[in-house]
Design a protein with these regions (language model features):
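Active-site residues of response regulator receiver
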Residues: 54, 84
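Acidic catalytic/metal-coordinating carboxylates
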Residues: 14, 35, 61-67
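Charged docking surfaces used in two-component/phosphorelay signaling
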Residues: 17-25
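Conserved acidic carboxylate
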Residues: 10
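The feature encodes the CheY-like receiver
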Residues: 16, 58-61, 76, 88, ...
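Short amphipathic alpha-helix used as the core "switch/output" element in two-component signaling
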Residues: 41, 63-76
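C-terminal output helix
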Residues: 108-117
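Acidic, metal-coordinating helix/loop segments flanking the phosphotransfer/catalytic sites
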Residues: 32-50, 67
């Protein structure tokens, strides 16, 4: 599925750089945002095929941004995966209940990361 556009919403420079490197090496087009508001505006201008949303962002919670995107008809069905260090018991379930389609824990396991992306970029995808 190379050529698909993936928006990475991440405020940490090193995490953004690593994620971007992995995605580009797999042939994906990477769009970047460092805040939730920047992401929302960018999505309006250039809708991505998939969004990787950090949960903790400087301007608002990534989950608040997910709620805003889910309320908008043009982004309601866009795949959104939480990309987060929140790995306590119950975090995954809470994040999925808040509107994310999937969950990827940091630090990233590259093989699992790519497998998960491919699963959600498949047109016949199912929620995790």
């Amino acid at each position: 599925m190379p050529g698909k556009r993936i928006l990475v919403v991440e405020d940490d420079f090193m995490n953004m750089r690593l994620t971007q490197h992995i995605l580009k090496s797999e042939g994906y087009t990477v769009l970047k945002a460092t805040t939730a508001l920047e992401a929302i505006e960018q999505i309006k201008a250039t809708p991505p095929d998939l969004i990787l949303m950090d949960v903790r962002l400087p301007d608002m919670s990534g989950m608040t941004a997910v709620r805003i995107l889910r309320e908008n008809a043009s982004t309601r069905d866009t795949a959104i995966l939480a990309l987060t260090a929140c790995a306590m018991k119950g975090d995954r379930e809470r994040i999925l209940q808040m509107g994310c389609d999937g969950y990827i824990a940091k630090p990233i396991n590259i093989r699992d990361f790519i497998t998960t992306l491919r699963k959600f970029l498949d047109p016949g995808r199912q929620k995790q």
